Amino acid sequence: MNVSRKPVSIVSFNSNLGLIEPAPGKEPGVKKLPEWLRKFGFFDLVDHQEEIGLEPPPYSMYLDPVSDMRNTDSIAAYAKQQALIIQDVISRKHFALVLGGDCSIIIGNALALKQLGDYRLFFIDGHTDFMWPSLSSTHGVAGMDLAIVTGYGHDKLSNIHQLAPYFKEQNVWCVGNREYDISYIAAIENTAIHYYDLKTLRQSGIPGSISSFFASLASGPADGFWVHLDVDVLDPLIMPAVDSPDPGGLSYPELNMMLESLLSHPQCTGLEITILDPDRDPDGKIVREFILEAGAAIQRSLAKE
C-alpha cells in the first residue's frame, strides 16, 4: 500500500440545507452521500488516517426575509462549526477530503481557509454558482455559493466574523460551466474570476487552465489552494444522480486528468465533493462508477510522493 503524501482526514459535511425540495415534503438526498460512498467502498479505497463527521441542522425550506435566501441562519451556524474542524485538520498538516452534502458546504470550508491565511480556489462545477437572490428562482444557497465566498450577497453568509471575502476574485478559477444563458453568465463575467466554461476549457485544453492556475500560485504569496468538485460537471449520461443535470459535461478521463494534476500538487490543501444524490442512484450503479473512476484518481493523487 502506498503511503500518502499527507495524512488524509475524511470529513463528512452532509448538509442539504442549500437545496430546495425535489418533491413536496421530500428533503434532498445528498445528505446520504457519505454513507453511500462508504457502502460502495470509497472509504476502503482511499488511504486515510481518520474520519470526522458533523451532523447538519434539520432540513427546511425556510426563506429568511432578511437575506432573501433559504436556511441562512442554519447554514451560517453550520459553517462556523465546519470552520473549526477544517482549521484543526489543516493545522495538523492533514489533507481534508470533504464529503457533502450540497455546495453550500463550501462556505464553512472557505471561512476556515480565510482564518488560516491566503488561499486560492479551483472550482469545478457544471454551473457557476455565481448569483445572488435577485437572480435566483429558488433562493437556494447551493446555487449562490461561489458568489458568497467571494464576498457577494448578504453579510449573514458572505461576511461571517467580518472576514469577507473568503477568497479574492483574482484567486479563483471557475471551470466547467455549461449553462450559457447570457443573463446567467453576465454576473461572473463582470468579475476578476478566471472563468473557463466547458467550451473554453476544451478549446484551451485542460492542462492550459491548470497551468495558468499553478502559475498564479508561483507568482504571489499563497498558503495553499482548495478544490471544489460538484459532480454535475460530469455528463449526465455518466452522472445523472444530481439535482440539475444539463446535457454535455466532462467525461471521467477529463475529470480525472484535472483531479490528478491538482491533488498531487504539494500546495493542495483539500477537496470537497458535492451533489451526488443517493436517492437518484437506488442500485448504487452510478456511485460505483464514480468510485472506480474519480475515487481511484483521488487515491492515486494523494498517494504520490
Predicted regions and their residues:
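Conserved alpha-helical scaffold segments that buttress catalytic/binding sites
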Residues: 2-305
